[in-house]
Amino acid sequence: MRKNVKQQLALRVLSTAALMAMVSSIATAAFADTYDLNKGSVTVETKEDGFTYVTQLDNTQTDGYARNDKDDILHDYQDKTGVTITSGGEKTSNTITVETAKDQTTDVTLQDVHIETESSWNNTGSAPIEIKGDGDTNLELNGDNTVLSGDSHHAAIEKADKNGHGTLTIKDDLNDDNSTPKDKDENGNAAGGDTGTLLAGGYGNGAGIGGGSSDLADTSNITIKGGKVTARGGCEDGAGIGGGTYGKAKKHPH
């Protein structure tokens, strides 16, 4: 009898181990807290399922759930805390793309990011930071951030109506260590000299924050809620904050 009990226990242990191995093999890796932009461009996408997927160097990670082909939840990953991207203050030409589906929200923290894309008048480049989709994107400012476009067709932080009518909110709700400040100043920023900064500069036809040129010129639904933000347009009449050359800035229903 004891032998049978031992055999049953052994089988249960083996079955549990096999199940855990299956979960490990099927599960998608949970995303890291912080991404180093020096290692490659980063794409952050919140899809209609409400899960956020982060891709860097063809490696995609998620904050959501791993599922099998029957859509059963296999493993619950970390709570959503948003994504932090940094270059440690070092200049890079790698870019950030944030895309948010309708009725969803993506939270991204810029921590000492310094992006300068290569100079181009042939519209062959890309925006340093591109905001896409019909959902809500929040950019939290930590440390000192510099975003400069080198392409005459693109804004530094580009949010073109062609790519969606969602919202972009730039804010400074948290301390630089992502803790909640005890006090805020009259502008709503973290008090005590912990204000995040942003310098966004367009090039040519692009805005500092907003539209690029041509079919990317129109923009909408941009809010600066906090932080110390300096935005300058390109030399061909791009706005500091607003549309690119000949573009319009407006509040668009989404």
Regions found by a protein language model. Give the residues of each.
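Bacterial Sec-dependent N-terminal signal peptides
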Residues: 1-19
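A composition-driven surface/loop motif
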Residues: 16, 27-254
